[in-house]
C-alpha cells in the first residue's frame, strides 16, 4: 500500500495584542519565552514550508524576528476576526490560490505538531473546502460550558453543526442528570485550528456573517451556512486547551515549570 505524500503547507498565526480577557497575550511569558514564540516553534515542528505571524503590533513582530523560517505580516488594526487578518496576510505573502494554509491560533503554545500536520493532510485528501480538528469531551463541565464549542459529524466525517450547547442533546440522560458524560454516544469538542486553500480563505473573509454565526458567535458557521464542507478529524493525540484567561496562563506556566 502506497501512502499519499504529506501535504505541503504554510502555517499562519493571527496574533493581536489587545486581547480583552488577557491583555498582551502573545507576549505573556511561559517559561523563558513569550507565548507567540512557543506557538511559532510548534508550527515549525509540524513541517510547515513557512510560518507567518500576522499581527498589527510591532512588539509581537520583534518577539519572533530572530526565529529562522518565521515571517511577519504587519496587518491593519481594524480587522474584526483572525480570518480577516489572515486574508490580508495571504495577500502580503503572495500565496497562490491553491496554497494550503493552516490557521493556528496564537494562544495554542502546546499544540501537538501531529495535529497541525493532520489538518493539512485532511484538507489535501478530503476534497472539502475547509478542515479542522476535534477531540473527545471528557468531562461534564466541558460538555455544558458554552466556551467549549461542541460539534457533530456525518458518516463521511464532515461537520454537521458547531454549537456552544451540548450537542447531540441526550434526551433521556440530560433530563435527569448532568454531572457526567453519557456512556452512549460520542461528544466532541472543537479545536480551533483550520485548514483551507488561500483562494477559499479570501472568499471566506468576503462572506457576510449569516444568522447562525450571529446567534452562536462562531465564525465557522458562516462557511456551513453558505453550503461549503468542513472536514473534521479526531485529533491523533491529546490536545491541550488554549490560553484565554489569566488562570489558563498560570496553568501553562506551572506546566512548563514542572517539566
UniProtKB/Swiss-Prot annotation:
Q: What does this protein do?
A: Activates KDO (a required 8-carbon sugar) for incorporation into bacterial lipopolysaccharide in Gram-negative bacteria.
Q: Which GO terms describe its biological process?
A: CMP-keto-3-deoxy-D-manno-octulosonic acid biosynthetic process; lipopolysaccharide biosynthetic process
Which pathway does this polypeptide act in?
Nucleotide-sugar biosynthesis; CMP-3-deoxy-D-manno-octulosonate biosynthesis; CMP-3-deoxy-D-manno-octulosonate from 3-deoxy-D-manno-octulosonate and CTP: step 1/1; Bacterial outer membrane biogenesis; lipopolysaccharide biosynthesis
**Annotated protein name in UniProt:** 3-deoxy-manno-octulosonate cytidylyltransferase
Q: Which reaction does it catalyse?
A: 3-deoxy-alpha-D-manno-oct-2-ulosonate + CTP = CMP-3-deoxy-beta-D-manno-octulosonate + diphosphate
| Enzyme Commission code(s) on record | 2.7.7.38
Q: What's in the GO CC field?
A: cytosol
Keyword flag Cytoplasm: yes
List where in the cell it is found: Cytoplasm
Q: Which UniProt keywords apply?
A: Cytoplasm, Lipopolysaccharide biosynthesis, Nucleotidyltransferase, Transferase
Q: Which GO terms describe its molecular function?
A: 3-deoxy-manno-octulosonate cytidylyltransferase activity
Amino acid at each position: 500500500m502506497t501512502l499519499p505524500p504529506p501535504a505541503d503547507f504554510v502555517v499562519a498565526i493571527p496574533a493581536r495584542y489587545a486581547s480583552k480577557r488577557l491583555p498582551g497575550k502573545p507576549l505573556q511569558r511561559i517559561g523563558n519565552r513569550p507565548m507567540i514564540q512557543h506557538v511559532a516553534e510548534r508550527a515549525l515542528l509540524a513541517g510547515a514550508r513557512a510560518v507567518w505571524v500576522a499581527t498589527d503590533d510591532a512588539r509581537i513582530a520583534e518577539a519572533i524576528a530572530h526565529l529562522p523560517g518565521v515571517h511577519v505580516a504587519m496587518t491593519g488594526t481594524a480587522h474584526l476576526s483572525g480570518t480577516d487578518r489572515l486574508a490580508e496576510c495571504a495577500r502580503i505573502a503572495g500565496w497562490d490560490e491553491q496554497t494550503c494554509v493552516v490557521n493556528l491560533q496564537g494562544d495554542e503554545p502546546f499544540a501537538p505538531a501531529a495535529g497541525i500536520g493532520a489538518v493539512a493532510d485532511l484538507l489535501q485528501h478530503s476534497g472539502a473546502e475547509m478542515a479542522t480538528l476535534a477531540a473527545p469531551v471528557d468531562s461534564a463541565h466541558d460538555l455544558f460550558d458554552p466556551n467549549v464549542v461542541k460539534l457533530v459529524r456525518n458518516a463521511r466525517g464532515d461537520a454537521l453543526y458547531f454549537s456552544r450547547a451540548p450537542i447531540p442533546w441526550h434526551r433521556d440522560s440530560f433530563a435527569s442528570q448532568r454531572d457526567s458524560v453519557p456512556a452512549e454516544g460520542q461528544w466532541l469538542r472543537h479545536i480551533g485550528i483550520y485548514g483551507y486553500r488561500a483562494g477559499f480563505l479570501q472568499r471566506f473573509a468576503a462572506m457576510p456573517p449569516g444568522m447562525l454565526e450571529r446567534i452562536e458567535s462562531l465564525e465557522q458557521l458562516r462557511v456551513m451556512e453558505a453550503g461549503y464542507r468542513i472536514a473534521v478529524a479526531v485529533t491523533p493525540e491529546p490536545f491541550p486547551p488554549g490560553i484565554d484567561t489569566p488562570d489558563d496562563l498560570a496553568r501553562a506556566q506551572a506546566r512548563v515549570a514542572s517539566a
